[in-house]
Amino acid sequence: MQTRYGRRALTIWPLLLLAIAAEVAATSLLPQTNGFRKLKPTVAVACLYTVAFALLAQILKFTDIGIAYALWAGLGTASVAVIGVLFRNERFSWKHAIGLALVVTGVVTLNLQAGQ
């Protein structure tokens, strides 16, 4: 990942992965809120999204928003889709597979471009 401070890239990756994990966990918990009618899952979702955005804000001190957000959104989207299939019995077709492959390809391409 391209950074404004060289060596700090090593500290950005763990923060980015934590931000993605918090966002994925929050998104995965959303159905349990029952439209924000259940207090505990709603509070958990709000806290996890707060953590995700706070970490993203810290990451943006050291890297470009276009790269960081694309990686966050792409990897988060792919992760939520996989979690949906594995744990929520959601459908998965060849169209889903192609879409996820395109997302992953986009993330890899952005990463390669950022390294130049």
From Swiss-Prot:
Induction details: Is transcribed only in the presence of nicotine under the control of the transcriptional activator PmfR. Forms part of an operon with nepB, folD, mabO and purU.
Pfam families tied to this protein: Multi_Drug_Res (PF00893)
Membrane-spanning ranges: 10-30, 42-62, 67-87, 92-112
Entries under InterPro entries matching the protein: Small_drug/metabolite_transptr, Small_multidrug_res
Keywords carried by this UniProt record: Cell membrane, Membrane, Plasmid, Transmembrane, Transmembrane helix, Transport
Cysteine-cysteine disulfides: none
Keyword Nucleotide-binding appears in the UniProt entry: no
GO CC, one annotated term: plasma membrane
Nuclease keyword on record: no
Membrane topology: Multi-pass membrane protein
Main subcellular localisation: membrane
MF (Gene Ontology): transmembrane transporter activity
Subcellular location: Cell membrane
Role of this protein: Component of an efflux pump responsible for the transport of nicotine breakdown products, in particular methylamine, out of the cell. This pump apparently serves as a metabolic valve for nicotine catabolites and may protect the bacteria from the potentially toxic side effects of these compounds.
Similarity comment text for this entry: Belongs to the drug/metabolite transporter (DMT) superfamily. Small multidrug resistance (SMR) (TC 2.A.7.1) family. NepA/NepB subfamily.
Subunit organization: The efflux pump is composed of NepA and NepB.
Name assigned to this protein: Nicotine metabolites export pump subunit NepA
